[in-house]
Amino acid sequence: GTDINFVVLNNQTYRTKNLVCCNGSDALTMEFDLVICNLPYLATDEILDAATDGGKDGFEVPKKIFDSIYKNIKIGGKFLFVTSSLSDYQKLMDYAQKLGLSSRILAKKKMFFEELIIVEAKK
């Protein structure tokens, strides 16, 4: 697993091995069948919290993560990501398609003030 926040990696609820502190998958060279990401999707004017702030339209930071992860997805592999109705999730899906990934919504869950959306993007 990767995270940009070293403290988060060291304080997981469910401990695991092979953790890397990096942006997206910039430090990784291997390919994976499945990549799962809880994107920082909230639309914000400035990035104050790397865990939640996605920049303009909630797209700016996720785009960088997509660009980083794309090289690590095997042909036929899947990229599952969580996004929100508070962001421009269609813009994310369109960008995935621009990269050559076919995308579709797998699930939606209404919460108090937003709807969480799980998207599958397949290479």
Walk through the language-model features, giving the residues of each:
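Conserved Class I SAM-dependent methyltransferase catalytic core
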Residues: 61-120
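Mobile active-site "lid"/loop adjacent to the S-adenosyl-L-methionine
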Residues: 39-64
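Conserved SAM/SAH cofactor-binding pocket of Class I
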Residues: 1-37, 43-44
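Short amphipathic alpha-helical segments
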Residues: 13-14, 47-50, 92-94
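Short, well-ordered secondary-structure micro-motifs
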Residues: 30-32, 47, 92, 116
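Short, hinge-like loop/turn segments at secondary-structure boundaries
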Residues: 36-38, 97-98
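Active-site-adjacent beta-strand anchor residues
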Residues: 2, 55, 82
